[in-house]
Amino acid sequence: ENTMSELKVSIADAENAKRTVPELPSKTSDIISATKMLKEPIDYSSFIDAIKEKQSALENSILQMRQITAPTESFVIQRIADVEGISGVQAVTEDHDPNGNLNKAGGYTACIYFSSSLINQDEVFGNDIVEKGTDCGGCIEGYPTIEEAEKRNTYLSAFDGAGMLDSGSHNILGSIVIRTSRTLTATQQSELTQKISEKLLELQ
């Protein structure tokens, strides 16, 4: 919305800067003066550059929104695999899903758990990353719509600060819920979430 508004403002500025042709003066001297003024060139380059810049920003914003709305499993894995601090990734399947929500009504269409190098994996129970769950690092849940992601985020909020039931940090990016382990510090959670967000938004 902001990029669209900024583009509209730039277009309006350019419209306001356009030279208007005045009514024909009655006096010859006034006609000569008006003619000289109209012959003077106007530099519209700054307005054109501003419009191009805002248009490019809008186009990029649209592309980014497409990336983070109902993302595919392969897209998420490809992006987060290179995030600093993530040591491994594993996607859930319908046969191997702790929550049993994959592809169900109201559930996620992609769910990728990841391990963090900041956490001692030997101290987290489970045979693989999915079994260890968010405790070993975190999870990326992709939903068909933003509304479904928000509903999931609200549900997770009910467990904030609930000790062993605390599900860690959870933030929305488009129709994605980015979760990080409760065993990480608040700063580590925030930094990891930021790095993941940047990778998911990156235009390649």
Question: Which functions belong to the PLM regions below?
Answer:
Residues 63-83:
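Surface-exposed beta-loop interaction hotspot
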Residues 1-69:
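Amphipathic alpha-helical assembly segments used for oligomerization, scaffolding, or translocation
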Residues 19, 66, 79, 152, ...:
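Arginine residue identity/basic-tract feature
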